[in-house]
Amino acid sequence: MSTSNPDLIELAREYFRRLDAGSPALLELFAEDAEFYFPKFGVGRGRDQLLELITGLGGAIESIEHDTSAYKMTLAGDTVFVEGTTRGALKSGERWAVGETPGGRFCNVFEFRGGLIGRLAVYLDPDYAGRDEAGFLWGRQGRSW
């Protein structure tokens, strides 16, 4: 697959669309030997481990929405850096929304090879609902989310 660099930003947007839809076609965006990182999962390799990550998240997350229209997307060669926000709900019924709750901000680093994701690193706090009270070292009062 031949892809020009500006198309890589669109491929990153497509990743978020498929992720939000829970589409099995999400895996098609990844190279067979893709490497990825997600907090508390660690580093994974290949589509089988990626499916394991997605299945685990699907067991906890009821819905998630990425509004890519406001994202900061930076292209550097075959790498796309994305700073963005999410909103969603956990299967427990707890909800999160950036600006309203502590969870919801993230940064992804996509490295593309041959028009596919060859490496993806996701940096976020996976405590979407803010359950980890001990992690709020400065307290919750007076904070902007």
Protein language model features and the residues they cover:
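A solvent-exposed, acidic/Ser-Thr-rich amphipathic alpha-helical stretch
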Residues: P24-G77, T85
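Short, well-ordered beta-to-alpha junction loops that form the rim of enzyme active sites
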Residues: G84-T86, V122-Y123
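Exposed beta-sheet edge and beta->alpha loop/turn motif
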Residues: T85-R113
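Short, solvent-exposed loop/turn segments at secondary-structure boundaries
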Residues: K40-F41, V80, E94-V98
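Hydrophobic/aromatic beta-strand elements that line small-molecule binding cavities or substrate pockets
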Residues: T68-T74, R105-E111, L124
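Hydrophobic pocket/interface hotspot
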Residues: Y15, L26-L27, A34, G46, ...
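Low-complexity, intrinsically disordered terminal/linker segments enriched in charged
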Residues: R119-W145
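Short, low-complexity N-terminal intrinsically disordered segments enriched in polar/charged residues
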Residues: M1-E32, R140-W145
